[in-house]
Design a protein with these regions (language model features):
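Short alpha-helix
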Residues: 175-198
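A short SAM/SAH-binding and catalytic strip from SAM-dependent methyltransferases
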Residues: 115-128
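A short acidic, Gly/Pro-enriched loop at the edge of an enzyme's catalytic core
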Residues: 104-116
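Class I SAM-dependent methyltransferase SAM/SAH-binding core
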Residues: 55-57, 61-105
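Conserved class I S-adenosyl-L-methionine
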Residues: 1-49, 63-67, 88, 144-170, 174, 207, ...
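Core SAM-dependent methyltransferase catalytic element
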Residues: 210-230
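A short glycine-rich, Lys/Arg-flanked "PGG" loop and its adjoining helix->strand segment in the class I
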Residues: 129-141
Length: 230
């Protein structure tokens, strides 16, 4: 769904590539571990150290790649379409390969990976089916696809993905609302079966870092899904 009917903040909005190009410098200072790493750490159906060959779609600055290496992932590639984000990922040295490409059309060989991962990027897609189809194409038989996303609850409450420029001006990055059922439909049509799901809510750790979020206490802010190839 188009986000604009729900937009309460009316920040200037940037296209995705332009937005992340500008945000690259401060991205890791803004995105909290409670948004994504907390949920990844709670996943029970993936043995990261035994995951085989892994692809981090929309890898950004390499935050997730660094976490994956710390969990024992041995073979890891990172892919992103924003050069400025990818340069920071490459500088971390956590990926065997860094690939500049669109995650919906990677150009990578089919059945190349045992596990495909996409974290905090799906809200920028106008439609989900291409993501799930490309992940299915890249995954080997019985492969796994892990998705961690910004919860639609927050988008429906008018809060887009956004950051502050150097001068303090807040700007948003183009976002779309995908219900959790939209993920289920797109995944099933692409041949995936849900193995696990979790949701992260705003709790004390969040509020300690963002006191103004007290008003959102116990609201769902992110989600994780683990899919398996049928």
């Amino acid at each position: 769904m188009d986000f604009s009917p729900f937009d309460r903040r009316r920040y200037p909005t940037l296209p995705v590539r332009e937005g992340y190009r500008e945000w690259a410098e401060t991205y890791e200072d803004v995105v909290q571990d409670e948004m994504d790493l907390r949920l990844l750490a709670r996943i029970e159906t993936v043995d990261w150290a035994q995951a085989g060959r892994v692809l981090d779609l929309a890898c950004g600055t390499g935050r997730i790649g660094a976490w994956l290496r710390a969990q024992g992932v041995q073979r890891l590639d990172g892919l992103d379409f924003t050069a400025e984000m990818l340069a920071r990922a490459e500088a971390k040295g956590v990926y065997d390969r860094v690939i500049r490409a669109d995650m919906l059309d990677t150009g990578l060989p089919a059945a190349s990976y045992d596990l495909v991962l996409e974290v905090l990027a799906d809200e920028h897609l106008s439609a989900l089916p291409p993501l799930y189809r490309e992940a299915a194409r890249l995954a080997r038989p019985a492969g796994t696809f892990v998705v961690v996303g910004y919860h639609p609850h927050f988008l429906l409450n008018g809060i887009p993905t956004h950051f502050d420029r150097r001068d303090g001006e807040p700007v948003a990055i183009e976002s779309y609302v995908h219900l959790l059922s939209d993920h289920a439909k797109a995944a099933h049509r692409a041949g995936w079966t849900l193995a696990e799901m979790d949701e992260g809510v705003v709790e004390d750790a969040w509020i300690a870092k963002k006191p103004k979020w007290e008003r959102y206490r116990f609201h769902p802010v992110s989600f994780a899904m683990v899919w398996r190839r049928r």
